[in-house]
Regions:
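Conserved catalytic motifs of ABC-family nucleotide-binding domains
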Residues: 301, 413, 523, 636
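Exposed loop and linker-edge segments at protein-protein interfaces
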Residues: 145, 297, 409, 417-423, ...
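Bacterial N-terminal signal peptides
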Residues: 12-25
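Short, low-complexity, Pro/Ser/Thr/Gly-rich segments in the mature regions of secreted, periplasmic
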Residues: 681-692
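C-terminal accessory/binding modules appended to enzymatic or scaffolding proteins
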Residues: 374-402, 595-630, 635-639
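C-terminal soluble interaction/assembly domains
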Residues: 408, 424, 430-432, 437-439, ...
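Serine-dependent protease modules
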Residues: 28-296, 300, 306-335, 341-346, ...
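Bacterial N-terminal signal peptides that target proteins for export
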Residues: 1-15
């Protein structure tokens, strides 16, 4: 079966608050669409011929931390094939956090893909199409060619290609209005992806080829039919593309290494002050503690004029990304010379770069704690005034989960330092210590937790593990009416010609139960039980008749005085024990598939008007954002089989799902009955998040 994506959200970055930032340095009006001459038609034809076949519409399932869980969300974006091996370039914000990726080519062929690597700082991700899954004899995938973004000029005609709003591929035409589009420093925090300031290294190509949400990741193409940018941002008719030279460099490094390695020095810079005497150089705004720059003696107020032999200059914000690219692109561990101006005098220092850490490590779900959490980086530790990066940063908490129920409760933003007196270095250590504490235990285990909140240190006790429901006391076996009724109110009695009468009216008789066997019918008015009046005349008396029946023993006979039509008659009913309540039936909650099922009750079958021979289990609930819900399973469904194996009870469901966690199939097919309909529900788990 083919992957059938759920209703996608369209992935696109739209700067609603940054409209003023996109004022082009030089604007030229686009040629009206209804006045395209023959030369323009040739340009369009060439661009479309060279790139359009290589367009890719991308559907993704991404995992995002929320309420102590990694929730699944669907999304859609665009991309372009850049090699015969099936490599696809798109944006990080489209596919960088994807657990499942499916691509539709321009000819509507559908191919699954894997994430090769991603770079949030440049907002570039690379996918690889699963070409081995294609049918034999099919033609090679079309490939688009890179162009030189440095050759792009204001006024150049360009074409934005992609899949706006997740619809089929499209092309729009416009011109370049700015080749150095940036976000001003006072608004740089407005565009961060996974903590990374994208604008620190990117100068966008601004253009007015119309783009919408869903165009993200699609190519910006010149008249020669070459990729000169990867579309990323949009506001109204103004779009911004990552220059192809930067995108290509990042993509090639991802293909080679799976990620982008960058150097870090710890120097933070800004353009020279307006009253600066110096005519060149980059102003050092600050130096990070314990960084290579600090070790080299670089100070705030220094002007860097040369870095590793390259002259540098920055008098305006537009020049900052070039300096950052130079520093970040230096080989890790290289000793470089930095020339400075300090107090008007030249100074030369040397420093050795170190590897740059990501701004934010990826979050992970720790189900036994009811939280999502992530490791700390050097910068995260410094910003939190911590002496080292040991510990685990709590990202979100599941309400009612182990962390949420602790006193004092652990909150998002807290840093877990110790478990039972043992240091927690990172998430791996937390998992290991948790496993040690719960080994061989079936009930939750209380652990002593040291954690930091701000600059204060707190302690709490967390019950780690799954909380089992408390045993419920046995129910007394008392009979039930085996029928649904309504109170014979005064108004209803008068309307039915029974003024002054009290009792209940039968609204439903449960098939196969005592009332049905006795011959009770819908519409009967029950006035008395064994000669005792049913004193029910207002809505608050709804339980009067039921209470009268429960006073008898199971198996006893009760004579009902009934009015049917205009005739009064006696009906003898042998009283039965009520069916087992739903909360007393076998139940199974799967924390990985995030759904709860239970055995079907007699009342389930009655209320759903199902034949008593129906074999299956009831899906009691699915967790929003879980794999079951994302695949389309819903609370109220009757689960009949899994992968063609019948599921007559919850024990069988548990057995099948536990076996699936060992074999890890690509897909699991649930056959369900929903109302009068039956359907197949495909669930495609991301096994990386199972048993965590």
């Amino acid at each position: 079966m083919q992957y059938a994506p759920r209703m996608p959200r369209v992935l696109g970055v739209v700067f609603l608050l940054l409209a003023a930032c996109f004022l082009p340095a030089c604007a030229i009006a686009a040629r009206p669409a209804d006045n395209i001459d023959s030369a323009a038609q040739v340009e369009i034809a060439q661009a479309v011929r060279n790139v359009y076949p290589a367009l890719v519409r991308i559907y993704v399932v991404i995992n995002e931390p929320d309420d102590g869980r990694m929730r699944k969300l669907s999304g859609a974006g665009s991309g372009v094939i850049i090699s015969k091996d099936g490599y696809v370039v798109t944006n990080h914000h489209v596919a960088g956090n994807a657990g499942r990726i499916v691509c539709n080519l321009a000819d509507q062929e559908e191919i699954e893909a894997q994430l090769v690597g991603t770079d949030a700082l440049a907002d570039i991700a690379v996918l690889k199409l699963d070409l081995a899954s294609r049918k034999k004899g099919i033609t090679p995938v079309p490939v688009a060619q890179w162009g030189d973004s440095n050759a792009v000029r204001v006024g150049d005609v360009v074409f934005a290609m992609g899949s706006p709003a997740a619809v089929s591929q499209s092309v729009t035409r416009g011109i370049v209005s700015n080749t150095q589009l940036i976000i001003p420093r006072n608004m740089e925090g407005s565009f961060r992806l996974d903590g990374e300031n994208v604008g620190s290294i990117v100068r966008w190509l601004a253009h007015d080829a119309i783009i919408f949400g869903g165009n993200s990741g699609g190519p910006l193409v010149n008249v020669a039919g070459q990729i000169v940018g990867i579309n990323e941002i949009g506001l109204g008719s103004l779009g911004g593309a990552i220059p192809s030279n930067l995108a290509r460099s990042v993509a090639e490094r991802i293909i080679a290494d799976g990620h982008v390695k960058r150097s870090w020095t710890g120097v933070e810079v800004q353009p020279r002050l307006k009253d600066a005497v110096a005519e060149s150089g980059v102003l050092v705004a600050g130096v990070v503690q314990d960084s290579p720059a600090q070790a080299a003696g670089i100070k705030s107020g220094d002007l860097i004029t040369s870095f590793d032999g390259s002259a540098v200059d920055c008098s305006i914000d537009e020049q900052l990304p070039l300096f950052n690219q130079l520093v970040l692109g230096t080989p890790i561990g290289k000793k470089v010379e930095v020339k400075l101006i300090r107090d008007g005098k030249p100074v030369a220092v040397s420093l050795t770069t170190i590897a740059r850490e990501p701004a934010l490590p990826r979050p992970e779900e720790v189900k036994s704690w009811g939280m999502t959490a992530r490791n700390l980086t050097r910068m995260m530790a410094l910003e939190r005034m911590r002496s080292d990066k040991d510990g685990v940063l709590v990202d979100s908490i599941r309400p009612g989960g182990p962390c949420g129920n602790s006193k004092p409760g652990i909150n998002a933003g807290d840093v877990i330092r110790k478990i039972d007196g043992k240091c927690v270095k990172d998430l791996a250590a937390l998992r290991e210590l948790s496993a040690e504490a719960t080994k061989g235990k079936t009930d939750p285990v209380s652990v002593l937790v040291d954690f930091d909140r701000g600059t204060g240190g707190l302690m709490t006790v967390v019950k780690v593990g799954k909380e089992e429901p408390a045993d419920k006391p046995a129910l007394a076996r008392k009979p039930w009416p085996a029928a649904a009724t309504q109170v014979l109110t005064r108004d209803l009695a008068e309307s039915l010609g029974m003024k002054g009468k009290t009792g209940v009216r039968v609204t439903e008789v449960y098939t196969g139960m005592a009332a049905a066997k006795a011959g009770l019918e819908v519409g009967d008015i029950i006035l008395a039980v064994d000669g005792i009046k049913v004193e029910a005349s207002q809505p608050s008396d709804a339980d009067v008749y039921d209470t009268m029946i429960r006073k008898y023993d199971v198996g006893a006979e009760a004579v009902l005085t009934v009015i049917r039509g205009k005739e009064q008659k006696k009906i003898t009913m042998t009283l039965d024990a009520p069916p087992t309540p739903s909360d007393r039936l076998a139940k199974y909650e799967d924390q990985d598939f995030e759904c709860t099922v239970r055995d079907l009750s007699v009342m389930d079958r009655i209320q759903k008007k199902e034949d008593q021979s129906l074999r299956g289990v009831l899906v009691e609930r699915t967790e929003p954002g879980g794999w079951a819900a994302f695949g389309g399973l819903s609370g109220g469904d009757v689960l009949i089989s899994i992968d063609s194996v019948a599921t007559p009870d919850v024990a069988q469901v548990e057995k099948i799902l536990k076996a699936a966690k060992q074999s890890k199939p690509r897909r699991i097919v649930f056959f369900v009955k929903r109302g009068i309909h039956t359907m197949y529900v495909e669930i495609e788990p991301d096994w990386r998040y199972v048993n965590h």
